[in-house]
C-alpha cells in the first residue's frame, strides 16, 4: 500500500499491522481508474494555478509542479509510465512519480485539497468530457434520422398502439418521434 513520508500507509496511519493481500487487491483501483490520468493531471494543474493566484505557492514551485505533471502526462500517453498496483489508484501513481521527478515540492498539490476533492474533481471532468462525446453522437444520429425522414415524408407505415394495429402514419412522422426523444435526452446531458 502507498506510504506517506513517515513510511506509513495512506489509509492506515494508526494501524500497526500491514494489510492482507486480499485487502490490498480490493483496495487497489488502478486497473480501473488509470484511464482518468488526463483528468487527474488537469485537475492538479488547475489546483496549483489556483494556489499560485492565491499567493500560497511561488511561481517557481507552480512551474516545477506543472513541468512534472506535463512530463507524467507525456509518459502515460507514450506508454512509458509504469502503473504500480501498490500505489492503489491513479492519484497515488501520479503523485509518486511527481515526487520522483521534482522532489518534495510535489507535496504542494495537496495543499487545501483532500483526496476526496481530487477524486470528485477527476470524475466531474471525466463526466463532462464523456457527456460532450455523447452529445456529439446524438447530434449525428439526429441529423441522419432527419435526413431519412425528409426522404420518407410520403412513405406510409402501419401505426401501433400497445402493440396492436392503429392508424397508418407517415414513416417520417414516426422517425421524427425519435428525433424528439433524442433531443429530450440531449437536454438531460446539458
Q: Residue spans of the language-model regions?
A:
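A helix-coil-helix interface module used to build multimeric assemblies
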Residues: 2-190
Amino acid at each position: 500500500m502507498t506510504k506517506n513520508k513517515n513510511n506509513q500507509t495512506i489509509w492506515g496511519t494508526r494501524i500497526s499491522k500491514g494489510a492482507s493481500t486480499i485487502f490490498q487487491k480490493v483496495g487497489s483501483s488502478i486497473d480501473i481508474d488509470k484511464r482518468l490520468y488526463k483528468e487527474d493531471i488537469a485537475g492538479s494543474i488547475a489546483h496549483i494555478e489556483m494556489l499560485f493566484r492565491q499567493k500560497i505557492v511561488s511561481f517557481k514551485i507552480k512551474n516545477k509542479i506543472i513541468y512534472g505533471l506535463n512530463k507524467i502526462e507525456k509518459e502515460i500517453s507514450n506508454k512509458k509510465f509504469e502503473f504500480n498496483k501498490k500505489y492503489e489508484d491513479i492519484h497515488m501513481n501520479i503523485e509518486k512519480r511527481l515526487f520522483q521527478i521534482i522532489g518534495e515540492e510535489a507535496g504542494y498539490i495537496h495543499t487545501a485539497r483532500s483526496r476526496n476533492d481530487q477524486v470528485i474533481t477527476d470524475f466531474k471532468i471525466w463526466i463532462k468530457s464523456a457527456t460532450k462525446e455523447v452529445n456529439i453522437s446524438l447530434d449525428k444520429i439526429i441529423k441522419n434520422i432527419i435526413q431519412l425522414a425528409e426522404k420518407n415524408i410520403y412513405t406510409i407505415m402501419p401505426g401501433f398502439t400497445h402493440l396492436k394495429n392503429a392508424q397508418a402514419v407517415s414513416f417520417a412522422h414516426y422517425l421524427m418521434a425519435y428525433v424528439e426523444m433524442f433531443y429530450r435526452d440531449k437536454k438531460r446531458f446539458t
